Amino acid sequence: MRPHVEIIDQADLIWHPGEFPLAEGAAVQKHLAYDEEDGSLSAVVRFDTDWSRCGGIHHADTEWFVLSGQVTIGSEVLTEGGYWMAPKGVVTPAITATKGTEILLFREYGDWGFEPADADRPGLREDQVLVIVRSAEMEWLPVEIGSPMRFDLGGTPVPGLFIKMLHRDSETGFYTRLIKAAGGWQEHPLAHHPCYEE
């Protein structure tokens, strides 16, 4: 398991070689959280050269959020705020990143393994598909309303917070979202957990 993460300063973290088998180009990553048991990871990744990898299947649920630069996945070009998610077993198209691009990488339920493929693995649910989102084109939604938070799955309305829901697993309810707080917002400790892992 990954240790519980409090507030960290990424400036204190060191760069490691990027964990991208079968890729061409150079990348480095800073581990924000790393599960040494199964390889799950949250990291900042920097591409030090133009970078590319063929289409294939990751050994983990894999998410990229573009902080700066440009990522092309299949025919989709993503810039700052661009996001993609591929569940384990779903084909990720060929992908490129331009030199200097930085992303947040999230990898769950598996390690850095990757195999070339042009078809999804059998046995996937119908809703397990490649997701591509441009968060800059999304509206910030107040957490006071139930959608998209789905309070029936847990959580509490939190006035003053706003989210952009990037992905939600319909079976587990697990999700990836962006959060922003209104000016002067203060947390009520019973309404919201005080730690952000990613």
Write out the residue ranges for each language-model feature.
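Short loop/turn motifs at secondary-structure junctions and domain boundaries
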Residues: 23-24, 54-56
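A short, N-terminal "cap"/entry segment at the start of jelly-roll beta-barrel domains
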Residues: 1-37, 114-175
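A structural signal for the main folded, soluble domain(s) of proteins
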Residues: 44, 49, 158, 170-171, ...
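Short acidic (Asp/Glu) patches
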Residues: 47-50, 67-68, 85-90, 107
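A short hydrophobic beta-strand segment most commonly corresponding to one strand
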Residues: 44, 84-85, 98-116
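Glycine- and acidic-residue-biased ligand/ion/polar-headgroup-sensing regions
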Residues: 48-51, 57-73, 80, 182-198
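Short acidic-glycine-tyrosine-enriched beta hairpin
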Residues: 72-93
